[in-house]
């Protein structure tokens, strides 16, 4: 038993928080294969029962970043990866928004995986749309540079995550690893729109982003529990801008968007969700388009492309109506 895991389990058994340096060391021990399955399970369960701190989340992310593959990216790159886990069954809102954001001129390094909530993750829907999940890091760099968007499949860039797959599966509960995806972008995206599935995660993830040196980001959770900027009502959000953290509320009706029901946003199988995304990019109007505009507009504000969400929504609408967003999809398909 390593010193780090012994000390960590001792502290967790007393419901005490782990110091950042100790957390970083114990994750390194985990990644190097020095921990037994029982120790890994105890660590993850202990953190979950105690409640993970922003410092613990950031230390996990820093250790995993060091173990993952990386790509070079333009300075203004953004990611729309969220935590998932809201179990809402909506279509792939942030993935669809990624095409719109890229069409508006902000490079998007979309980090994602197969489904974590609902029935369809970003990888599942992009695969249905004809985008290769097997792009090499070199190809992804080219896509980002010349097309303005790429998909970074988490399984390719973070093979070390496989070291805890069995323990996570056998525990069967949410663990700290469910929070890490948005913090592990291989392109090091300095801008983010990060949806979380619970109001309790909002300040934690915002603080973790601040610790990790995020340039500017918006963390959001809908009052309906959606891990997106929602269209059914208000969204609680936090803007991280360098060293500052600023809470605010997003109300769709203030931007001329009609409220809808969760039923209006429902998705289905990967094939069905792919069709929803395609129809939006082809110009279909309605609540599905509107929630994509709202999320893309918020992301463009986070990326400093727009002075506010209202201007961001206008830029997002132009991206869709001009065909630029659809063109991003077509170029990515052609490069597969």
Swiss-Prot record:
Q: Name its co-factor(s).
A: Mg(2+)
**Ligand binding (anthranilate 1):** 82, 113
The UniProt annotation places anthranilate 2 binding at 168
Q: What is this protein called?
A: Anthranilate phosphoribosyltransferase
Q: Which residues bind Mg(2+) 1?
A: 94, 228
UniProt keywords, alphabetically: Amino-acid biosynthesis, Aromatic amino acid biosynthesis, Glycosyltransferase, Magnesium, Metal-binding, Transferase, Tryptophan biosynthesis
Q: Name one Pfam family in it.
A: Glycos_transf_3
Give the molecular function GO annotations.
Answer: anthranilate phosphoribosyltransferase activity; magnesium ion binding
Q: Does the keyword Amino-acid biosynthesis apply?
A: yes
Q: Residues that bind 5-phospho-alpha-D-ribose 1-diphosphate, according to the entry?
A: 82, 85-86, 90, 92-95, 110-118, 122
Q: Which cysteines are joined by disulfide bonds?
A: none
Name the gene that codes for it.
trpD
Catalyzes what? N-(5-phospho-beta-D-ribosyl)anthranilate + diphosphate = 5-phospho-alpha-D-ribose 1-diphosphate + anthranilate
